[in-house]
Amino acid sequence: MERPVTELVLNPGAVPLAEWKAIYRGASARLAESAWPVIAESAAAVQRILAKGEPVYGINTGFGKLASVRIGDADLETLQRNIVLSHAAGVGEPSPVPVIRLMMALKLASLAQGASGVRVETVRMLEEMLVEGLTPVVPCQGSVGASGDLAPLSHMAATMIGVGEIFVGGQRLPAAQALAQAGLEPLTLGPKEGLALLNGTQFSTANALAGLFEAERLFQSALVTGALSTEAAKGSDTPFDPRIHTLRRHVGQIETAAALRALMSASEIRASHLKEDERVQDPYCLRCQPQVMGAALDILRQAATTLATEANCVSDNPLIFPEADEALSGGNFHAEPVAFAADMIALAVCEIGSIAERRIAMLVDPALSGLPAFLTPKPGLNSGFMIPQVTAAALVSENKQRAYPASVDSIPTSANQEDHVSMAAHGARRLLAMVENADAVLGIELLAAAQGCDFHAPLRSSAALEAVRALTRSKVPHLSDDRHFHPDMEAANTLVRSGAVIAAVGALPGVTA
């Protein structure tokens, strides 16, 4: 059975973003040994609480609007099985495997903090599934982000009792078969365990973290394509002077301006028009890159701070406090912080794509760029980059619609017992699609900017940007005459999505380092 190569050791409550990113990128994880006694004590506390004979939500009562219904001791195991099966009610395509593996790791770290009352064997089952590469098939739709991500996490929990389906090495297998192949026995859930597994914000948080990690790469790629576009248009680097940005004081803006200066350093193209250039100021899409991209960087970092906290939290209900043998009902399952963070990421992704599209539009317009119309040597006979710019506009428009805040919506559920919800799940889930659109826009900009710089030969750009141009030309030749454009765009998109564009220039400001 195929297992992830890298295996991390998670310290519950203190896992850095870099480790969550590594899991998203394919690493596996086990809990630190110090977690197991804490888990065992929490489970023992549940038994002591039950022995008191008092009604405790989710342990010996019904759920949601049915919380007032008392459940007898003989039915406690059935109660937990029933909540898992009845709540596994998601719809839609399966969520991406990297996102669900991240969700599993988040749940693992949450359960290990000793506030959920789950037995050691239950937590070990989840850990073994993660290590062995068993990924539950989790439909992507069905969570409103309070009471946690009930439907998605129920699909995960169902596989642990042998119900549902699991991805293993690219195959989609019945859960019982996949567990058997890995030498694992389906669980019989104990008191509170079903509720503990399915109550929490881990699905929303995993999707938001995935969006954050991809948005960071998008941001860095856009610094590179933006600098290359500035060179193609013979734009000025004066707007990136540090004195300007020091006065504005925003850290992201200051770092972005410094990165753009470094990317364009020692450019022959830039030196060629330092004198005798009649233009006084560049268009905003060039001149205001530090202000726009810096604001995006700052807001991504704010979102990262929120998500780093959420990733290390316990969002179960009720919470078990072994030192007092108490179970306290609260609302940590409400994913409003995640919803806000996802909305911030969506805004940043939208704006990164929006200003990039404006740079493409500037490059294809000879009145603005001074380059041949639509970046073709024979305009009229050839259409050049005319329609790629249209495609970029379409993608940016889609992202503008998707950027509408999810957190401002709420629909009451569970007979108005759960009367305000966060909508964090779909707010976070849209992020990967938005980044995919913006990636395609940057791929188009990469081609357009490289084409524009070609017209300035034999002048060369900076060493960093020449490395990017050489990388681009290794996959896509100069456009002398019209040809089938789609393969060129796909090749450029791959350079953006793979991080190759970033690797070509070296270190850039980031979010999660």
Swiss-Prot record:
Its EC number is 4.3.1.3. GO terms for cellular component: cytoplasm. Its main location: cytoplasm. Coiled coil: none annotated. It catalyses: L-histidine = trans-urocanate + NH4(+). It is an enzyme of class 4 (lyase). Pathway: Amino-acid degradation; L-histidine degradation into L-glutamate; N-formimidoyl-L-glutamate from L-histidine: step 1/3. The modification 2,3-didehydroalanine (Ser) is found at S147. Contains an active site 4-methylidene-imidazol-5-one (MIO), which is formed autocatalytically by cyclization and dehydration of residues Ala-Ser-Gly. Keywords: Cytoplasm, Histidine metabolism, Lyase. It is found in: Cytoplasm. There is a cross-link at A146-G148 (5-imidazolinone (Ala-Gly)). One of its GO terms (molecular function) is histidine ammonia-lyase activity. GO terms for biological process: L-histidine catabolic process to glutamate and formamide; L-histidine catabolic process to glutamate and formate. Belongs to the PAL/histidase family. This is Histidine ammonia-lyase. It comes from Caulobacter vibrioides (strain NA1000 / CB15N) (Caulobacter crescentus). The gene is hutH.
